[in-house]
Amino acid sequence: MSSHKLEVFTDYVCPWCYLGDSRVKKLKKIFNIDIQIIHFPLHPDTPKEGKSLLDLFVTNQEDIDNKNQNMKNLMSNENLPYSNRTHTFNSRLAQEIGSWAQSLDNKTPIHDNFFEAYFVKGLNIGLESVILEIVAKSGLDENEAYDIINNRTFKSSVDKDWEKSRTYGVTGVPTYVYNNHSVVGAQPIENLVDFLNHFGVTKL
């Protein structure tokens, strides 16, 4: 475990976080640093069945099509698959399961699998059945995850993340925090490298 820790404030339904996650992986290949995912409430009031992007952004289909195409272009530059989004979904339970998975193994693939389920497959990651499929794909115990979802075992863990977001003044994601300093947005990898170099983070 490294003595250097980069906190990444993120939400599974944030396209910029999906993009930023790819760049964080590149950082891990350059620096001896631990990544700590801090869950952020991007659209916490989204109903279980989801909300259309038309309603979320109060816009028209042409605008949604343009947004999707712009994101596809950006994702393509990172070699990330990306499908047209039509809805956003409530990510709260997914965050609780993500917090559980991270407590078991900081290198868990579950974060990648939640991003893939939503941004590539268009699945509603707020549904228990979908979450359990992602748990299984991530090599984790479905029965334990079922109990965690229904008992809300990791509710307080995500509550603390949300409170940390407020304490740090985080209003947009992704936000990267190191040594009480932050950068906001899906920054180019060069900017993130400069950010960590500034604090003398050890390179591999």
Show the residue positions of the predicted features.
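Structural alpha/beta surface segment adjacent to cysteine/selenocysteine redox centers
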Residues: 18-121
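C-terminal cap of thioredoxin/glutaredoxin-like
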Residues: 2-10, 16-33, 99-104, 109, ...
